[in-house]
């Protein structure tokens, strides 16, 4: 809810698919109060991984022993496991956000 996707074709000038025609989508937010960007992003990643398993991969860690970039953004390694349902990841993220909101209350000045 709150977003419309339309097909998009482009040719990247850099990175893995530089110079190759690629298909994707343009996301247009129609209702900023209804769209949930984190949930949408994770659901899209899960769908892409499901539809194109041979082509889907996470960017590798920048340094050996480090976490992949997406895991760093997420704050944990849950999404690296292909069997981890998006709904479980989102529930975990909601619990962590609620815990953070409670902890930060002590630091509010007004």
Predicted regions and their residues:
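Conserved functional hotspot residues or short segments at active or partner-binding sites
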Residues: 1-92
